[in-house]
């Protein structure tokens, strides 16, 4: 299982999810919502292949990627023919959602129910890198909100798993709690 928990990354992914949910309700903003969900998904997946590298245990803890795990995942995908032709002879793409998916140990993927979303992760594996600028030649002409829903489900599962691991991070502990009601001012 994962040696180091990275709750700040989970919180960051959640923030991108919240932005995506707001954006998908805006006029002509679905593409931007999808990109925000892709960034959130990238951060969430990277949270499982990262380890703290500074300010351990503090609110502003920093992390570094395990490039070894990403390379192993990339090599596996190349072996099974799931690396796009234009990337075959290039180093691993640390933004590729499918590579990040396979960098996560399988028992964790199963526990957080990530495995059931592999199809959507593969479909949207390059949304962030290939869809940021819709005016570019080759940019997708259609968008959807599926990744928003997948990220929403996964954050719930990841937070539950972090709680099982005994994580005491404030975001993890308070996640899902209703906001406190303010009492009316007494005049």
Segments (PLM) and residue ranges:
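Long, charged low-complexity segments
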Residues: 1-8, 18, 53-187
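Non-catalytic amphipathic alpha-helical adaptor/oligomerization segments
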Residues: 9, 35, 43, 57-58
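A long, hydrophobic alpha-helical segment
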Residues: 13-31
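Short, hydrophobic, well-ordered secondary-structure elements
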Residues: 20, 30-52
């Amino acid at each position: 299982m994962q040696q180091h928990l990275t709750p700040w990354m989970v919180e960051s992914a959640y923030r991108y999810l919240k932005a995506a949910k707001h954006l998908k309700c805006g006029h002509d903003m679905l593409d931007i919502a999808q990109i925000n969900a892709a960034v959130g998904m990238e951060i969430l997946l990277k949270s499982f292949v990262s380890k703290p590298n500074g300010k351990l245990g503090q609110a502003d803890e920093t992390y570094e990627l395990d490039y070894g795990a990403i390379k192993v995942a990339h090599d596996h995908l190349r072996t099974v023919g799931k690396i796009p032709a234009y990337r075959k002879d290039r180093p691993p793409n640390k933004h590729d959602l499918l590579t990040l998916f396979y960098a996560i140990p399988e028992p964790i993927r199963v526990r957080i129910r990530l495995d059931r979303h592999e199809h959507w992760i593969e479909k949207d594996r390059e949304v962030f890198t290939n869809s940021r600028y819709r005016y570019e030649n080759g940019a997708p002409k259609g968008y959807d909100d599926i990744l928003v829903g997948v990220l929403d489900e996964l954050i719930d599962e990841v937070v539950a798993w972090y709680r099982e691991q005994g994580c005491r991070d404030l975001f993890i502990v308070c996640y899902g709690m209703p906001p406190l009601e303010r009492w009316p001012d007494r005049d």
